[in-house]
């Protein structure tokens, strides 16, 4: 506990909030190139083959990014757009690839939450909404 005299001399240091997505450098999204596309298994209670890509960003940093949705067209040297947002059961994966932007295709036959997966409006959905 500092004395009043010590506080007058030095003052208190402000604690700076550390960002959870450091590689974005305060940008909402970043462009990058896939260096490796692979699948990994999640942490203990869960079981699956999660699709992940290693991405080299335009600022020179390399990060692991999750590929959401069913099926994807990514391969090495694909240009992708990434956003922040971790995957809780994959250690070290703190970013998501944005579907439907740049080289990443949207999820095919997606009916709900289409904007999150870059899916275009199908004619069937259009007819239902008009009625």
Swiss-Prot record:
Name of this protein: Small ribosomal subunit protein uS12
Organism this protein belongs to: Karelsulcia muelleri (strain GWSS) (Sulcia muelleri)
Gene name as annotated: rpsL
Cited Pfam families: Ribosom_S12_S23
Function: With S4 and S5 plays an important role in translational accuracy. Interacts with and stabilizes bases of the 16S rRNA that are involved in tRNA selection in the A site and with the mRNA backbone. Located at the interface of the 30S and 50S subunits, it traverses the body of the 30S subunit contacting proteins on the other side and probably holding the rRNA structure together. The combined cluster of proteins S8, S12 and S17 appears to hold together the shoulder and platform of the 30S subunit.
An example Gene Ontology CC term for this record: small ribosomal subunit
Family per record: Belongs to the universal ribosomal protein uS12 family.
Gene Ontology BP terms: translation
Origin organism lineage: Bacteria, Pseudomonadati, Bacteroidota, Flavobacteriia, Flavobacteriales
Keyword tRNA processing included in the entry's annotation: no
Keywords: Methylation, Ribonucleoprotein, Ribosomal protein, RNA-binding, rRNA-binding, tRNA-binding
GO molecular function annotation: rRNA binding; structural constituent of ribosome; tRNA binding
């Amino acid at each position: 506990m500092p004395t009043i005299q010590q506080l007058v001399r030095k003052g208190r240091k402000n604690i700076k909030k550390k960002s959870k997505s450091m590689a974005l450098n305060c940008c909402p999204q970043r462009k990058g190139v896939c260096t490796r596309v692979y699948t990994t298994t999640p942490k203990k209670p869960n079981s699956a083959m999660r699709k992940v890509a290693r991405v080299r960003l335009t600022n020179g940093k390399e990060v692991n990014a999750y590929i959401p949705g069913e099926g994807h067209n990514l391969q090495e040297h694909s240009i992708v757009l990434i956003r922040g947002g971790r995957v809780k059961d994959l250690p070290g994966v703190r970013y998501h690839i944005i579907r439907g932007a740049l080289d990443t295709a949207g999820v095919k036959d997606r009916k709900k939450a289409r904007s999150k997966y870059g899916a275009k409006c199908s004619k069937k959905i259009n007819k239902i909404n008009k009625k």
